[in-house]
Every structure is written in C-alpha cells, then in structure tokens.
C-alpha cells in the first residue's frame, strides 16, 4: 500500500503562502460553524527556531477557565525529526487571539517505553482533554502505537502559566 505524507515542498509552499517561516497555529471564527472560506485566518503562535517547538501544531480542544482559554499543542525540534512534546497556552477569555501565557519548556515529553518505542518513537501527541473534579485529564498517543492519559490539577497548571509563563 502507498502511504501519503506531506512533502517538504508542500510544507515550504504553505509557509510561503501564509508568510511564516515555521509551522504555526492559526485561528478562524465562524458564527454558524459552516461558513469558513470567507473568514480571515489569524496567526496565533508560530514555531520558534532552535527550540523544542520549532514545528508546532494544535492538539486538544481549548478549555474555558476563569483565567482564560487553556490550549495544549504539540511541538517538535529539528524540523520535525526529533521528539514530539506538549506545551500549553493561556488565551484571553474575551479575545482568544491574545496569548496571555506560553510554556517555555514542554509540560509533557516522551519518557516511558510506550512513548519511546513504536511506529514514531519518542512521541507524545495530545488529542483530547477533560476536567473532572479539578483534575485535567489529557489523552494522548504514545509513539503512534499506544494511548495514554496524563493528569494534573488544573489549578496548578493555570498557576504555573499565570505566574511563570506570562507573555506580557
């Protein structure tokens, strides 16, 4: 069988088209969730050269908290050939285009065998999350072979973001 993958040429085209050097996360807004084509795209965050998050992408759905919108994303260094790790953003409640905080280092990275050995080794890739009784449950793929769940107290993560990771 043939496996279809994004080519380097395609990635370069996309970056040139949108005027960014590295893969980025964008936002669009729609009143009816049906009409998107005529809506403008807004750059939220871009990858950072020479860091653990040179190449980034959206992951879990945002969670509305009193502090703002909590959003997790994945990042990978070396142009996408290194470990996939997880970072967090805190966006303004009223204007989610405004990034209030961004973790400088990953909050989750490959550590256990089910994250380091598999189809794509050294990869944690969050795909879903939920808060139950103040605990954030993050469901993620490990090494593109396993499914895992990581937990933390939501309040602790929000405190870390607001006290240590402010963008302003």
Language model regions located:
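Beta-propeller blade signature
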Residues: 24-32, 85-94, 151-158
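Short, solvent-exposed loop/turn segments at conserved positions within beta-propeller repeat blades
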Residues: 18-23, 80-84
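Surface loop/turn signatures of beta-propeller and other carbohydrate-active proteins
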Residues: 7, 34-63, 96-128, 157-168
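Single conserved hydrophobic/aromatic residue that forms the stacking wall/gate
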Residues: 1-13
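Blade-level signature of beta-propeller repeat domains, shared across WD40, Kelch, NHL, RCC1
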Residues: 130-164
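Loop/turn-rich, solvent-exposed surfaces of beta-rich toroidal or solenoidal domains
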Residues: 57-103
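Entry beta-strands of beta-propeller and related beta-repeat scaffolds
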Residues: 10-11, 68-71, 135-137
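Residue-level signature of beta-propeller blades and closely related beta-rich strand-turn architectures
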Residues: 15, 75-77, 142-144
């Amino acid at each position: 069988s043939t496996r279809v993958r994004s080519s380097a040429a395609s990635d370069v085209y996309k970056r040139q088209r949108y005027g960014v050097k590295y893969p980025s996360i964008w936002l669009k807004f729609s009143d009816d969730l049906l009409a998107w084509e005529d809506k403008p795209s807004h750059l939220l965050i871009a990858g950072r050269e020479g860091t653990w998050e040179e190449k980034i992408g959206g992951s879990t759905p945002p969670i509305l908290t009193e502090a703002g919108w909590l959003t997790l994303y994945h990042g990978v260094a070396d142009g996408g050939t290194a470990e996939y790790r997880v970072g967090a953003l805190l966006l303004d409640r009223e204007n989610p285009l405004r990034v209030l905080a961004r973790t400088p280092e990953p909050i989750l990275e490959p550590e256990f065998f089910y994250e380091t050995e598999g189809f794509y080794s050294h990869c944690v890739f969050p795909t879903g999350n939920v808060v139950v009784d103040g605990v954030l449950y993050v469901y993620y793929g490990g090494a593109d072979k396993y499914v895992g769940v990581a937990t933390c107290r939501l309040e602790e993560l929000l405190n870390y973001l607001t006290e240590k990771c402010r963008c302003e």
